[in-house]
């Protein structure tokens, strides 16, 4: 590695400076070795968290805030990485997390195992281009295998969808409540799913997640409607309204200030009284217009004047102010109402319906529950837990589980977990490799070994002997009928994972394989690492900041 200025010479021997002094350049095998080491280091950080028996990580940021999690995306997000190859891997992993809700750890660990196998091939003097070509062919066969063995799943297969959610939750800190939470997840996702043409569409933004610490995880509940994290604005208003007709307002119930600055000259108290009466009448008219539509609940995004609160209370209307815009949009989907920006245009047809609107105390706070719509296309999950960290980790776990169930509904396919898919792909790759022959055959076989290493990590984290169990798994997969055989990490037995209920979205597996292969091949193609030097220094080595201090 060179850290001095890079100099080239012309045919006449004239030196030409290419890189500034302070720049560094690493090239050839050394650059490849360093990049591979960086990827392996990121993989090592995640390996112990893989699978249902994986460990947690305690992450402390620069402010001293502590996060305890085994969520791959969270760990990578909070790691302060410096090496460009490591950052590249994290970017690809984040892309996996955005594309599908799970599979981040699988993508990173598989990428790490692939570059390890590539490193072994490099020591055998096999060119990186040949390795990349072999990996690409192996990836193609792996994706083809998943498409062939994946099982069809529909939105009505509630039992399978619950098992998908449970599989996702199994590896989280909330695994003790996985059955209860999986039921909530499956109900929430199927409720907001919509059939568009011949495909199912799921927008997870229509599932509101509200967190309140207190109680236990088992107090977490699904609400077929929306929870507004506000309280009723006036003590004289009803706290419970059945058969609610809801006005959703993106307009204030306050006296509007003129756009232009204006002054009103008042010469005697009667004029002041008339002015205040006129303001009051304006607000009363607004309330009367709302009441005339038949509304008995008002959810307002903006403010509600005290006078308007008084008149709303007199008419027995429950009102909430300063609701979030996102809550208003979800309420519209949940209740069938329409958000109105001008009170004068409010009609009975704009009102939403809910069987019950009620203010309830949750922990230390009061919240308004809007539930019991006829066919709500937006629902809420209220998360409870004794500690804020428990609530935060439950939220992360639920978001992953919601995403995996949504992935299965959108794609309509699922596969078994527990290493079954990886073993089946590895078996088929070993049969496919001799058909290619040459040095590429070695790369394809290395890809198969990397997939098997994923299963070995799963077994090791369960506390079992990986060599012994891998032999049993290979033997089981020789029989075509045993394609779903994997490792039960809770018993250490080789079992049919589909029958056991360990089920994952096919699209998550496919995207993890794509992301890992892309990361590994990208790293293998790099043979030159050029890093720019720090900003130039001035005045005999004094930095600009030091120079400025002297001037001050």
Curated annotation (Swiss-Prot):
Posttranslational modification, per the record? The N-terminus is blocked.
Give an example GO molecular function: ATP-dependent protein folding chaperone
Keyword list (alphabetical) reads: ATP-binding, Chaperone, Nucleotide-binding
List, alphabetically, the Gene3D superfamilies matched: GroEL, GroEL-like equatorial domain, TCP-1-like chaperonin intermediate domain
- Span-the-membrane segments of this chain are none
Keyword Magnesium appears in the UniProt entry: no
Q: Which domain of life is it from?
A: Archaea
Which Pfam families does the entry mention? Cpn60_TCP1
Read off the CDD domains from this record: cpn60
Entry function: Molecular chaperone; binds unfolded polypeptides in vitro, and has a weak ATPase activity.
Family membership noted in the UniProt record: Belongs to the TCP-1 chaperonin family.
Query: What subunit structure does UniProt give?
Result: Forms a Heterooligomeric complex of two stacked nine-membered rings; one of alpha and the other of beta subunits.
Q: What is this protein called?
A: Thermosome subunit beta
Q: State the organism named in the record.
A: Sulfurisphaera tokodaii (strain DSM 16993 / JCM 10545 / NBRC 100140 / 7) (Sulfolobus tokodaii)
């Amino acid at each position: 590695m060179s850290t001095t200025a890079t100099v080239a010479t012309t045919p006449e021997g004239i030196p030409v400076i290419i890189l500034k002094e302070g720049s560094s350049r690493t090239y050839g095998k050394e650059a490849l070795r360093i990049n591979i080491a960086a990827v392996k280091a990121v993989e090592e950080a995640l390996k112990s968290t893989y699978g249902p028996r994986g460990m947690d990580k305690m992450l402390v940021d620069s402010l001293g805030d502590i996060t305890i999690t085994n969520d791959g995306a969270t760990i990578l997000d909070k790691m302060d990485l410096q090496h460009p190859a490591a950052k590249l891997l994290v970017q690809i992993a984040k892309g996996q997390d955005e594309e599908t809700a799970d599979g981040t750890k699988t993508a990173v660990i598989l990428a790490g195992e692939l570059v390890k196998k590539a490193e072994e091939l490099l020591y055998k003097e096999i060119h990186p281009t040949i390795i990349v070509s072999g990996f690409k062919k192996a990836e193609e066969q792996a994706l083809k295998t998943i498409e062939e063995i994946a099982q069809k799943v529909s939105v009505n297969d509630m039992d399978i969808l619950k098992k998908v959610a449970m599989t996702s939750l199994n590896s989280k800190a909330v695994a003790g409540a996985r059955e209860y939470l999986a039921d909530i997840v499956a109900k929430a996702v199927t409720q907001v799913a919509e059939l568009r043409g011949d495909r199912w569409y799921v927008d997870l933004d229509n599932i509101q997640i509200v967190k309140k610490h207190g109680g236990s995880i088992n107090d977490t509940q699904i609400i077929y409607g929306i929870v507004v994290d506000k309280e009723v604005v006036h003590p004289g208003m009803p706290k419970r309204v059945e058969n609610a007709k809801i006005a959703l307002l993106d307009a204030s119930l306050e006296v509007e200030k003129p756009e232009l600055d204006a002054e009103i000259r008042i010469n005697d108290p009667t004029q002041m009284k008339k002015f205040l009466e006129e303001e009051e009448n304006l607000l009363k008219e607004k309330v009367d217009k709302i009441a005339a539509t038949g509304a008995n609940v008002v959810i307002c995004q903006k403010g509600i004047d005290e006078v308007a609160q008084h008149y709303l209370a007199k008419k027995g209307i429950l009102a909430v102010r300063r609701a979030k815009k996102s809550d208003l949009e979800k309420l519209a989907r949940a209740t069938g109402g329409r958000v109105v920006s001008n009170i004068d245009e409010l009609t009975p047809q704009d009102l939403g319906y809910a069987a019950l609107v009620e203010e309830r105390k949750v922990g230390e706070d009061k919240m308004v529950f809007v539930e019991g719509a006829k066919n709500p296309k937006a629902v809420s999950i209220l998360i409870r837990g004794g500690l804020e960290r428990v609530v935060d980790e439950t939220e992360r776990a639920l978001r992953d589980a919601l995403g995996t169930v949504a992935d299965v509904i959108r794609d309509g396919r699922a596969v078994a977990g527990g290493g079954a898919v990886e073993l089946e792909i590895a078996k088929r790759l070993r049969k496919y490799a001799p058909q290619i022959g040459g040095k590429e055959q070695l790369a394809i076989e290395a890809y198969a070994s990397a997939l098997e290493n994923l299963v070995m990590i799963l077994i090791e984290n369960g506390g079992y002997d990986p060599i012994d169990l891998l032999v049993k798994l290979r033997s089981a997969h020789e029989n075509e009928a045993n394609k779903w055989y994997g490792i039960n990490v809770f018993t250490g037995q080789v079992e049919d994972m589909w029958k056991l209920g360990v089920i994952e979205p096919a699209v998550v597996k496919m995207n993890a394989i794509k992301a890992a292969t892309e990361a590994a091949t990208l790293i293998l193609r790099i043979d030159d690492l050029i890093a720019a030097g720090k900003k130039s220094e001035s005045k005999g080595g004094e930095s600009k900041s030091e120079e400025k201090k002297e001037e001050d």
